[in-house]
Amino acid sequence: MEIPSTSSEMTYFSVKCAICYKAGHGQHFGVETCRACAAFFRRTVVLNRKYKCTRKSGKCKIGSDETKDVMCKFCRFKKCIDLGMTTENVRTDQVINLNVEPSTSQSLVRLEMTSLQPETDDSNRVQYQIIHPRTRGPAILIDVNAIIKRSKTILETHFFPDDDVIVELNPLEKMTFCLRKLRSKQSWNPNFFTKINFLDLFEFWESQMEDTATWLMYSGEFRKLPNHEKIAIFKIVWAVWRRLERYTMTAQVFGQKCYDEQILLHSHQDAARFTDYDVDYSYITDQGFEKINGLFGGKMIQYFDIIVKPYLELELSDTEIAYILCQIVWNYAGRRLQGQTQAAGERFLEVISNNLHKYYEDKSGNRKRAEDKQNYVARLAKMMQIVNQMLNAQLKMENTMDVAMLFNTFNIVFTEPEFFRV
C-alpha cells in the first residue's frame, strides 16, 4: 500500500547568503552564500582582480538597503574574507596561496599563476595553470563551476516537457521513466578506444553529471528541497550514480561479454576494455599509468563482480535498476549530509519500496503463490546486497583518493573537491 503524500508532508528550510542576505545556494568556500557571491569570490581569486572602495572608506554596508542594487566590490570581497571565505575551506590550499590585506583600499588577492593565464574573464574556461605552493612545480586548477553549469540549471528548474506524461506515474515509475529516457541516447554499437588523456574524461563526466541532475529532479521529494540542499546532494552522488548506471547499461548492451571481457561504456558513444586501454596521466602526475592503475584500477574492476555479475544473474529490469539507484543515492547522501536530506531520503525510500512491492504484485498477476513471494524476497535481498557493497566500495575509494591527495600524487586541484573525491 502506498503512503498518501498528504499524510506526512515535509517542509524544508532555506538559508540566506551571509554576504548579501539574498537567497542562499549552499556552502561555497566555507561560507553559506548565494551563487552570485560565490562566483564573485571565485573570479576575484582566479583572475587576480584588484578593487578600490567606491566610497574610499572601506566600510560599505554590504547587504543593506543602500547597497542592495550596486555593491562595492572592494567591500564585498572584504566581507567575504572577514566571514572566512578562503580557498583553504574547500581544500584547495595545496595549490592556491591567498594573501589578503583587507584594511587598505589597495588590498588584493595574489594567486600565483603562470604567464600563460589570460587577462579576460572566460566563464566557460575549465583549466588554469598555477604554481603548486608545496612542490613549487606546475599544477592545474580545475574550475568545477564551469563543468557543472548546465547541471545546475537543471537542478534549479521546475519544469519538464513531459510533465503531462508522468503525472499519473508513482514515484518509482517516474524514476524508471527518466532512466529509460536518458538511456535512449545510448549507442548499441559504440566506438572502442585504447588510449585517452585524463583531462578528456571530463567531457564524459560533464554529460553524466547532466544525466544525474535530470534523473534526480524526477524525484518529487528531491525537487521540494531548497536549491542549496539539492546542489549538496548532487555534488556527492553523481559519481556513484554514474558508476551503477554505466556498469548496468554496459551489461544490458553486451550481456555476458561485458563481464568476460571487462567492457565499460564510458559514454553513450564510447567504450573500452579494462584489459586493453590506458589513460595518459602525464599532464597531472609524474607517477605513470601503471602506478596510478595499480592504485585505482583494481577498485574499478571490482564493480564487475559487485554490479555486472548479479545484474546478469538476476536479469534486472529497468524498474529494479531505478530502485537500486534510489537506494544508493539516498542512503549515501543521508549518511554524508544527514539532517533534512536524511529525512527526505527516508521518506522517499519508504514510498518507492511500496511502489516496488506493487510492481512485483502486478508482475504476478492473479497468482498469489507462496513461492512467488519467496522469490521476490530473495531477489530484493540480492538487490540490497548490491547497494551495500556499492556503499562500502565507495567509502574505500574515498579513502584511497584522500591518501593520494595527501601525498600530492596528482598536481591537480578542484575548486570544489567534493565533486571528485571518487
UniProtKB/Swiss-Prot annotation:
This protein's record includes keyword Transcription: yes
Membrane-spanning parts: none
Cell location: Nucleus
InterPro entries given in the database record: C.elegans_Orphan_NR (IPR051152), HNF4-like_DBD (IPR049636), NHR-like_dom_sf (IPR035500), Nucl_hrmn_rcpt_lig-bd (IPR000536), Znf_hrmn_rcpt (IPR001628), Znf_NHR/GATA (IPR013088)
Alphabetized UniProt keyword annotations: DNA-binding, Metal-binding, Nucleus, Receptor, Transcription, Transcription regulation, Zinc, Zinc-finger
Limits of the NR LBD domain: 161-422
Keyword Lipid metabolism: no
NR C4-type zinc finger locations on the chain: 17-37, 53-80
UniProt DNA-binding region: 14-92
Gene Ontology cellular component terms for the protein in this record: nucleus
GO molecular function term, any single one: RNA polymerase II cis-regulatory region sequence-specific DNA binding
Chief location bin: nucleus
Family per record: Belongs to the nuclear hormone receptor family.
Role description: Orphan nuclear receptor.
Name under which the protein is recorded: Nuclear hormone receptor family member nhr-54
Organism for this UniProt entry: Caenorhabditis elegans
Lineage: Eukaryota, Metazoa, Ecdysozoa, Nematoda, Chromadorea
Gene that encodes the chain: nhr-54
